[in-house]
Amino acid sequence: MTNIRKTHPLIKIINHSFIDLPAPSNISAWWNFGSLLGICLIIQILTGLFLAMHYTSDTMTAFSSVTHICRDVNYGWLIRYMHANGASMFFICLFLHVGRGLYYGSYTYFETWNIGVILLFAVMATAFMGYVLPWGQMSFWGATVITNLLSAIPYIGTTLVEWIWGGFSVDKATLTRFFAFHFILPFIITALVMVHLLFLHETGSNNPSGLISDSDKIPFHPYYTIKDILGVLLLILVLMILVLFSPDLLGDPDNYTPANPLNTPPHIKPEWYFLFAYAILRSIPNKLGGVLALVLSILILMLFPILHMSKQRSMMFRPLSQCVFWILVADLFTLTWIGGQPVEYPFIIIGQLASILYFMIILLILPAISLFENKLLKW
């Protein structure tokens, strides 16, 4: 009799995805981040569900309800800080996952890559709306500033912003709808993750060499299950160190002050994982131009398959492209730093130069270096 795991309609899907899946024999630790993102998503949905049981999405009580969760609910402080810092871990894994895809040329799987970019947008939207929910000063002013950017859209901008707000400013209606969207989006993300995996399993995984690995495959279980478990343990270790020792390390002290529309904080800035995009937004003096640059800074990822000029898929054997890649990483660190600084000299000019370099590397330098490396292959 055949094993139930290979015959049962539901179990065989799991079997083909996580047990008998043929995987390349040489994928490194950089391939762990997919499973880590899955774990992050599960942690966020579970902690978020328990937070939603005690949270109230009303401007009068939202801040107090979060305080109540931390003070009065059993282990409420733990759930709240796991959720807040879980978001940071989520983005660390996301950035490393995308970086891996860029370095090893995984973007040549068009559908998988494009759904991944859509997922990135969805996670960013979810995180933004989640940041508004505690209704602290930075929640309120962050929501005001970011939603206000849509008013830069010609003709329909102002109407659109008021429609999103549900009034003439960020208020009760805004908070209620943000809570509703923040609750539903992770489930949409989960569905998209399944589609992401569906397309990935159509082609099979890429590997560090960028070469076809059909002739050398190993079963996912036990080799990569045990490897993923190690990654998960390390992820949970880092998350719990963050939560239990310095839960407010990545947060903003301003968010411990209840939202006050009459008092603007001296420096309005988003969470650390949005700072690079925020720096790009601020580096353009024109409102519409800034908004376009902000959207394009993420949307540009969709152009990578088109801009791939090299005859090799991975950067493993392309030292010049490697140098440019790491300059891009350094540039993103610079943008993240600038995004958290006040708008004054010399930060303005550094931000503008870093923003120009970001788009230059992706649109011009990397493709040009790739073409040059193709020439070197013939020497």
Curated annotation (Swiss-Prot):
Cofactor note: Binds 2 heme b groups non-covalently.
Cofactor(s) needed by this chain: heme b
Positions of heme b b562 binding: 83, 182
Phenotypic consequence of residue 233 to F: In strain: Isolate MSB 53282/NK 7980
InterPro entries from the UniProt entry: Cyt_b/b6_C, Cyt_b/b6_C_sf, Cyt_b/b6_N, Cytb/b6-like_sf, Cytochrome_b, Cytochrome_b_C_euk/bac, Cytochrome_b_N_euk/bac, Di-haem_cyt_TM
Description of how the protein assembles with itself and partners: The cytochrome bc1 complex contains 11 subunits: 3 respiratory subunits (MT-CYB, CYC1 and UQCRFS1), 2 core proteins (UQCRC1 and UQCRC2) and 6 low-molecular weight proteins (UQCRH/QCR6, UQCRB/QCR7, UQCRQ/QCR8, UQCR10/QCR9, UQCR11/QCR10 and a cleavage product of UQCRFS1). This cytochrome bc1 complex then forms a dimer.
Protein name: Cytochrome b
Lineage, broadest ranks: Eukaryota, Metazoa, Chordata, Craniata, Vertebrata
